[in-house]
């Protein structure tokens, strides 16, 4: 659809672009990225015929751009500008109708029924038909942008150029506009070429991305390849981190603010932050901790500052336990979004905790454990599914900076240590009469201060893994013994 070869040029004697070559396929949503001054707007001006170029070629549908008359070009390409303004006062419909100019013939440019059908269709597609009689200047920024998009679509172009189309739009309008662009690219095979400042939006919506740097192409590829952490840091000269989108297989880039000296101050989570009561065990950290957990609240990964292990009756049963737990936390002064919350049917005074230190990092481990519903995982299919409150709840606080894989290693290591504790105590699955590996609803938390020593791994023979193994084993054994003794005393 569009083929660019060796494009060089700029303004006056100043060359902004240097030997730029690429192609864009029919029905593709193609994003152009780059820092300020990289040549994005200059390139778009050349592609749309607004700015001449000195060297190279631009071919649209196999025909050189310079062979098109202005009217012919307007029948093939349309441009949605960055700013939404008009020199004269028009209604929405009149504004959209201007897009039909390129298709009108004769001296009097008569309005045809086909023009009317097309204008009504694109107004409906862009969601502006309901206010087509309102004046353009009375509309919000997002509405104006949609009207100008309808005007561009009224040209019935094969290629649509967008110059930072979401720059002045609210989040909802950004999503609406880009959802529509992607839909039209897929369903109508409209070729969309857009400049983006927002790397995350570009990564979410584009089929391919082109990254410019100082007038030259740095890379052209699918979003996940273009949006590499090291590359973006080098081109944009700032610190970022790359993470996957939580709902889609798309990359997302996050800027990392420069840390203040207080962000590096030593901090050790230990017994001084722990409070054990009859109803809850709570640990309140002075800073948010990076977490990975299977809690009722705060599950998955995140940042949390408060940690609650709540005692409930063994017959506890709520259809929406998340909502009930959230309400409970609120009534006790905790914000659910900032709290990892767990439940247990064991008495909280049987808790076991232990602080262990290595040369330059430490861990604080807390375990509540009962084995009334112990299960051998290898024979779990012999059990019926009954949701009961978590019985072995394990908290591991790491005073160090964990890598992503170290969180997962920590869970694996802790699980192995827990299984060994149950084996040594001869905890049996009451259904199968075999040694249990855990209970039906065990929960775990890994929380790191993200300060101090960088800890890449937490396997069983690593320094961190050794502390976790010993701490979880000892605390699990102690908690089970204390719980057994408590039951005997009842």
Where are these regions (language model features)?
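The feature captures the beta-strand-to-loop junction immediately N-terminal to the Walker
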Residues: 33-35
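Helix-to-loop junction immediately C-terminal to a conserved catalytic motif
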Residues: 48
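Conserved ABC transporter NBD signature motif
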Residues: 56-64
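ABC ATPase nucleotide-binding domains
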Residues: 237-270
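Alpha/propeptide regions of enzymes that mature by internal proteolysis
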Residues: 264-490
């Amino acid at each position: 659809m569009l083929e660019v070869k060796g494009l060089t040029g700029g303004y006056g004697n100043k060359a902004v672009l240097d030997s730029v070559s690429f192609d864009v396929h029919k029905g593709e949503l193609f994003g152009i990225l780059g820092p300020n001054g990289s040549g994005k707007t200059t390139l778009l001006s050349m592609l749309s015929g607004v700015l001449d170029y000195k060297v190279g070629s631009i071919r649209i549908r196999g025909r050189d751009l310079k062979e098109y008359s202005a009217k012919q070009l307007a029948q093939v390409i349309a441009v949605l500008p960055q700013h939404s303004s008009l020199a004269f006062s028009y209604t929405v419909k009149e504004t959209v109708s201007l897009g039909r100019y390129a298709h009108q013939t004769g001296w009097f440019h008569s309005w045809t029924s086909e023009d009317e059908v097309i204008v009504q269709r694109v107004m409906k597609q862009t969601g502006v038909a309901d206010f087509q009689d309102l004046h353009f200047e009375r509309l919000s920024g997002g509405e104006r942008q949609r009207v100008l998009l309808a005007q561009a679509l009224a040209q019935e172009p094969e290629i649509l150029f967008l110059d930072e189309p979401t720059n002045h739009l609210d989040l909802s309008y950004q999503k609406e506009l880009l959802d529509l662009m992607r839909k039209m690219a897929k369903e109508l095979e409209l070729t969309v070429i857009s400049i983006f400042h927002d790397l995350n939006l570009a990564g979410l919506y584009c089929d391919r991305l082109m990254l410019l740097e100082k007038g030259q192409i740095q890379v052209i590829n699918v979003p996940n390849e273009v949006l590499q952490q090291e590359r973006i840091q080098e081109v944009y000269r700032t610190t970022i981190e790359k993470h996957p989108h939580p709902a889609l297989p798309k990359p997302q880039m996050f800027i990392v603010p420069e840390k203040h000296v207080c962000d590096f101050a030593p901090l050790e989570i230990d017994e001084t932050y722990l409070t054990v009561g009859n109803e809850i065990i709570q640990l309140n950290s002075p800073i948010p901790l990076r977490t990975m957990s299977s809690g009722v609240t705060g599950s998955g990964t995140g940042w949390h500052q408060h940690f609650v292990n709540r005692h409930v009756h063994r017959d506890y049963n709520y259809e929406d336990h998340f909502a009930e737990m959230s309400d409970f936390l609120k009534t006790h002064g905790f914000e659910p979004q900032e709290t990892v919350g767990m439940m247990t049917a064991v008495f909280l005074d049987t808790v076991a905790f232990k602080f262990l230190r290595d040369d330059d990092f430490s861990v604080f481990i807390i375990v509540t454990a009962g084995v009334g519903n112990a299960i051998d995982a290898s024979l779990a299919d012999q059990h019926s599914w009954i949701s009961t409150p978590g019985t072995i709840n394990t908290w591991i606080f790491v005073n160090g900076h964990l890598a992503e894989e170290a969180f997962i290693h920590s869970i694996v290591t802790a699980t192995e240590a827990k299984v060994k504790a149950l084996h040594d105590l001869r905890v049996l699955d009451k259904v199968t009469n075999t040694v249990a590996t855990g209970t039906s609803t065990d929960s775990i938390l890994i929380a790191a201060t993200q300060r101090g020593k960088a800890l890449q791994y937490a396997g069983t023979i690593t320094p961190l893994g050794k502390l976790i193994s010993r701490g979880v084993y000892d605390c699990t054994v102690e908690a089970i013994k204390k719980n057994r003794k408590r039951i005997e005393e009842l």
